[in-house]
Amino acid sequence: MSKSLRKTHPLLKMANNALVDLPAPSNISAWWNFGSLLGLCLIIQILTGLFLAMHYTADIETAFNSVNHIYRDVNNGWFLRICHANGASFFFACLFIHVGRGVYYNSYLYIPTWMIGVIILFMVMATGFLGYVLPWGQMSFWGATVITNLLSAVPYLGTDLVQWIWGGFAVDNATLTRFFTFHFILPFIVLALTMIHLLFLHQTGSNNPLGLNSNVDKIPFHPYFVYKDIVGFIIFMWILIGFIWKFNYLLMDPENFIPANPLVTPVHIQPEWYFLFAYAILRSIPNKLGGVIALVLSIAILMILPFTHTSKFRGLQFYPLNQILFWNMVIVASLLTWIGARPVEDPYVLTGQILTVLYFSYFIINPLMSKYWDKLLN
């Protein structure tokens, strides 16, 4: 009997092994849906971004007006732009949930997969920042000025590095052109890294809610999880499109609807909501270099998790004290997001500093707590 084409054709065989005959644990919950949702988000962002790039001009004289032109004159351009802007917010929401699930269920023990995942997170954050600059509104210009200026904290090379990135002595036309170039290319690099992420994941197989070896109880990805993912896609698209039609500007900054003016500084400079937790950590450190290091560490610290793992069981579901600590961490991250949007004045400065200490202390207390719980069980 001849084998099916999907099992013999070189290209189809790869797709088959990843999406059809992939052995998957039978008990993975809805928290495992966010990986496929991130794939959907990336496709939405690349497609909407591609059509927006056809009408956008990366020039400081016309960038703001070209976005206006997309809204007013391009057929369904308003939908493309709002879908792209809100799609980014949904992308980051799914990313944070995906990372949170990895931390909760100790998925970071698949070290290569986890490391590539953290690199993807950095890349997506870079892409998001570059995209925020492109409409060339007030917050775009001043956000770019403030964030790129952080590189001046690098000892010895700082000033040259900033001017090299700007392409001059201030954020100007050269800056906008190169930011657009990198914003266009980075999603494709993220797509390539996603393939590597999946490649490493399929070497080991997925983790599951029990944290046990599930080789004795695996089922094919299709039809079971394909349909489960499709249900997730439908719910996600329903929420995203509802959000686009009803709350289209809720997550955008009103300042960014004013054309960029280098002579007028906004009252409060802030990035998009998905960077606010890291921005709050940056502002909490009085020293410039220390703030930049803390900013990078707020994400990079995820890379130390596999090496600080001390628990005998896999996942926080077996550690009640660690569960309390984890959800406390979620609240701390949410409060940091809120603090990042507040002005730099008391009591917000002190609150931000306390929350920053609590944020980083999680990564120290969590392994100690799980070790203590294991000792209690003995």
Swiss-Prot record:
It is a multi-pass membrane protein. The chain crosses the membrane at residues 34-54, 78-99, 114-134, 179-199, 227-247, 289-309, 321-341, 348-368. It comes from the Eukaryota. A ubiquinone binds at residue 202. InterPro entries: Cyt_b/b6_C (IPR005798), Cyt_b/b6_C_sf (IPR036150), Cyt_b/b6_N (IPR005797), Cytb/b6-like_sf (IPR027387), Cytochrome_b (IPR030689), Cytochrome_b_C_euk/bac (IPR048260), Cytochrome_b_N_euk/bac (IPR048259), Di-haem_cyt_TM (IPR016174). One of its GO terms (biological process) is mitochondrial electron transport, ubiquinol to cytochrome c. Its cofactor is heme b. Heme b b566 binds at residues 98, 197. The main subunits of complex b-c1 are: cytochrome b, cytochrome c1 and the Rieske protein. Heme 1 (or BL or b562) is low-potential and absorbs at about 562 nm, and heme 2 (or BH or b566) is high-potential and absorbs at about 566 nm. Component of the ubiquinol-cytochrome c reductase complex (complex III or cytochrome b-c1 complex) that is part of the mitochondrial respiratory chain. The b-c1 complex mediates electron transfer from ubiquinol to cytochrome c. Contributes to the generation of a proton gradient across the mitochondrial membrane that is then used for ATP synthesis. Belongs to the cytochrome b family. This is Cytochrome b. It comes from Aedes aegypti.
